Amino acid sequence: MPKRKDIQKIMVIGSGPIIIGQAAEFDYAGTQACLALKEEGYKVILVNSNPATIMTDKEIADKIYIEPLTLEFVNRIIRKERPDAILPTLGGQTGLNMAMALSKAGILDDLEIELLGTKLSAIDQAEDRDLFKQLMQELDQPIPESTIVKTVDEAVTFARDIGYPVIVRPAFTLGGTGGGICSSEEELCEITENGLKLSPVTQCLIERSIAGFKEIEYEVMRDSADNALVVCNMENFDPVGIHTGDSIVFAPTQTLSDIENQMLRDASLKIIRALKIEGGCNVQLALDPYSFKYYVIEVNPRVSRSSALASKATGYPIAKLAAKIAVGLTLDEMINPITGTTYAMFEPALDYVVAKIPRFPFDKFEHGERQLGTQMKATGEVMAIGRNLEESLLKACRSLEIGVCHNEMTSLSNISDEELVTKVIKAQDDRLFYLSEAIRRGYSIEELESLTKIDLFFLDKLLHIVEIEQELQMHVDHLESLKKAKRYGFSDQKIAEIWQKDESDIRAMRHSHSLCPVYKMVDTCAAEFDAKTPYFYSTYELENESVQSNKESILVLGSGPIRIGQGVEFDYATVHSVKAIQKAGYEAIIMNSNPETVSTDFSVSDKLYFEPLTFEDVMNVIDLEQPKGVIVQFGGQTAINLAQSLSDAGVTILGTQVEDLDRAEDRDLFEKALKELGIPQPQGQTATNEEEALEAAKKIGFPVLVRPSYVLGGRAMEIVENKEDLREYIRTAVKASPEHPILVDSYIFGKECEVDAISDGKSVLIPGIMEHIERAGVHSGDSMAVYPPQQLSKQIQETIAEYTKRLAIGLNCIGMMNVQFVIKNEQVYVIEVNPRASRTVPFLSKVTGIPMAQIATKLILGQTLKDLGYEDGLYPQSQLVHIKAPVFSFTKLAQVDSLLGPEMKSTGEVMGSDTSLEKALYKAFEANNSHLSEFGQIVFTIADDSKAEALSLARRFKAIGYQIMATQGTAAYFAEQGLSACLVGKIGDAANDIPTLVRHGHVQAIVNTVGIKRTADKDGQMIRSSAIEQGVPLFTALDTAKAMLTVLESRCFNIEAI
């Protein structure tokens, strides 16, 4: 069927900021879809609030609106643009929920706008728990015994009838938000109450728990002619009961018989046909390990996290083809872009095993609740490909960047058997490592299967890995044992550890016996047809399918899995760098391990290696490809940390040289450079042990800011006020980076700002200065940033620009550089310099129109700023005001304190732009879901050192109609100063404490600060948690509250008696 001619203009709804449950996979899907629609000649309008994406680049759509994804703003854009149709299925849950809201508000009918891909009825049937249940019954598809509830009492009655455990699934939420497994009435009441609150339709499904069944997923496609196929089937290592986003997943399925596979495949195709979905769909099923009994768990009527994984696992571009199906094309008339000869109707066949392991944020949140359940907690994921399961699993383990090179954590060797068994039964994010430790201690896989319900097949693979370890221990320097270990995915580092040698010895031994990996192509057809894709994975076999081309090549290292501190911003820079390399006439090669991102789309680069970002794996690619050089600037700390070892091995690092990277990272060298350049910095010293740190703090004077060197995202950074706190910090935080010393700095409580600069070594372009709303002490990634600066004098801006130029030239920076400053009493101090792309590059590129990563790459390849037509110095400022605001995922992370400090906690960002600061702030707050009522009750609970400042805010809140409430100490201070506040009770005072008031809807906002030391007391954390759980705006920095107040004041009329 030919594409539709009756529509010309299509609006695509993006997925908004990155949060847990909705990450970079939607940037990948949205980018693919927009380009596919443009390719077919449609005019594409994109709406998204996230500036950190490739999707929001000008060339991706005809018109791009970076605006809040709220009904108010999307409605305005629709009325302005008048699209013929909207494609909502590529924006995750956000896109689907927005489509439903537009329909319910009558906007789609009013303007005669059609929904493409998935009809409203299908979204409703898949997402509304009652309608889904009815549909499954009509199709004769089994679902667990369940009921729909709208109150907690209804849930309790049903559970009493069918017995515990039960699962709670809120309707229309993402990543299992608000859901969970309940083993008791108390748990059921708590989880259902929260789930009803988080469901936009106040509805939860309560169902009989089938925890322990195998969890299987089918990624299916269907077109308007009712052609349907299975793109990929996947099997979770963990049984039902753990969210699939938090499970280790293998593709294709590993333990199903042919009969089971056909049975579940038929069910999946029956469901997509019944829903009449045109595009991609994900079906999750539970299979009884001991019979042919199965249940349908849920259906996602859209492109999802699993679609991105299935696309990368098979090479089949689901989002691209789904977009074309949405405009009428059919599977039997579209060519599969991988083979270039077969049609998209051919089901992909895999002659390899793919492993996905989630990446969790618990290295950042040590006190977070790590136990896994039906609510997702992972921030990102890694994928690895191998010829056997062991190989793909071990490659994925070393891709995680959590300090392991194998499925082994050495720290676990010290724990008791009792603790080990507990951790094996109660699944946490690191259960794989506990299982492997149990096998090393001699627990049988049958025992472990009965404790965990993990299939014996998977446990046997873990046992096989342990057997190879034992074989290596018994046969040191034995070539056949080495060959076997490499065939099953063991790293040189692990083998060296077992043989008590250096990694370089193993590498030398391999090379002396010509034992090197070959690279196989991902071709969707198990080599049945010729494929043209430059998409490769390594394995230890005979035939190499990756041939070095005659063209000079450049290798760009990606940034690995998405985690807090290193998000999609770095992937954005990687993709732009590749474009510039190709324009310069080189072959661009990407190496990365993240299946969610645009950089691992095989059509982006000339060659893609889906490999772990370790020294060994990178060197193997370099040995084969012999690139002209390697670019490490765009891969965040992941790539920077590899620069030294690659350089030592004789690899050419392009751009800023390793010794200059070191001068920015090494404290003593950096101090020396600043002295030579005449640039002030807060007084500071380096310490390698407790005594030195205490001596440094005594000399500098408390409070001090302490942190390890060579870290990203403020990892283990803290402000300490006295000796005891400093001792405690040294005992707990040095783990963060043991081979590097601790930095002890004078803490300056001033205004912070940051600069991204691009240098060719002689000239320096500064696209803009970003002013932070929150003062020093809040991590830059968690601060709201304003461009152009609103409160910095011309002189201060000139000083910042001058210091930046001196630094870039003095540190021999070629390419990107990020500098952070603090300003106090009109004095500018440098806090830190990062000689690489930073997380603000996409934001600043969008608001200034300067393609920063592309320019930096051209300079790295030898051009000058003058060649490219750019002047030296600060670029002319934008006429609009732009705000970058952080977005947090605290609702998904129980027991993680939402108090902001020097360690980064945000998972994503949004942008607000307008003609004034107030309007831009309003948009930013709307986009990051901080909706504040125009009046109501606001609670102040304030530390002594900021009560005076809070008082003036409270007076302003009162002037616009807010009722002021306060805790005892704060209320007393306010009263002394002539402002009366309603007293709220102490925690535990059931009728009147803050959590109770919040729960009953009597509080519209909370302002809570904890003083310079930032040690969170238990009461404070309970107050903050109650605000997060109930969705009440919470301000832990007075500057953020002040910004919100500015917005409210600008929206209020002045009402005064004459």
UniProtKB/Swiss-Prot annotation:
Residues bound to ATP 1 are: R129, R169, G175, G176, R208, I210, E215, G241, I242, H243, Q284, E298
Name all ATP-grasp domain ranges. Answer: 133-327, 671-861
Do the record's keywords include Disulfide bond? no
List the residue ranges of the region (Carbamoyl phosphate synthetic domain).
Answer: 547-929
Keywords, alphabetical: Amino-acid biosynthesis, Arginine biosynthesis, ATP-binding, Ligase, Magnesium, Manganese, Metal-binding, Nucleotide-binding, Pyrimidine biosynthesis, Repeat
Instruction: Identify the stretch(es) annotated as Oligomerization domain.
Output: 402-546
InterPro entries, sorted: ATP-grasp, ATP_grasp_subdomain_1, CarbamoylP_synth_lsu, CarbamoylP_synth_lsu_oligo, CarbamoylP_synth_lsu_oligo_sf, CbamoylP_synth_lsu-like_ATP-bd, CbamoylP_synth_lsu_CPSase_dom, MGS-like_dom
For the biological process aspect of GO, one term held by this record is:
glutamine metabolic process
Question: Where does the chain bind Mn(2+) 2?
Answer: E298, N300
Cofactor(s) for this UniProt protein? Mg(2+); Mn(2+)
Binding residues for Mn(2+) 3: Q820, E832
Catalytic reaction(s) noted = hydrogencarbonate + L-glutamine + 2 ATP + H2O = carbamoyl phosphate + L-glutamate + 2 ADP + phosphate + 2 H(+)
- Superkingdom classification of source: Bacteria
A GO molecular function for this record?
metal ion binding
Q: What class of enzyme is it?
A: ligase
Detail which positions bind Mg(2+) 2: E298, N300
Give the Pfam families listed for this entry. Answer: CPSase_L_D2, CPSase_L_D3, MGS
- Binding-site residues, ATP 2: R707, S746, I748, E752, G777, V778, H779, S780, Q820, E832
One GO cellular component this record assigns the protein to is: cytoplasm
The segment annotated Carboxyphosphate synthetic domain runs over 1-401
Region (Allosteric domain) residue ranges read: 930-1058
Start and end residues of each MGS-like domain: 930-1058
Q: Hey, which family's this protein in?
A: Belongs to the CarB family.
How does this protein assemble?
A: Composed of two chains; the small (or glutamine) chain promotes the hydrolysis of glutamine to ammonia, which is used by the large (or ammonia) chain to synthesize carbamoyl phosphate. Tetramer of heterodimers (alpha,beta)4.
Q: What is this protein called?
A: Carbamoyl phosphate synthase large chain
Q: Which organism is it from?
A: Streptococcus pyogenes serotype M18 (strain MGAS8232)
Q: Which gene encodes it?
A: carB
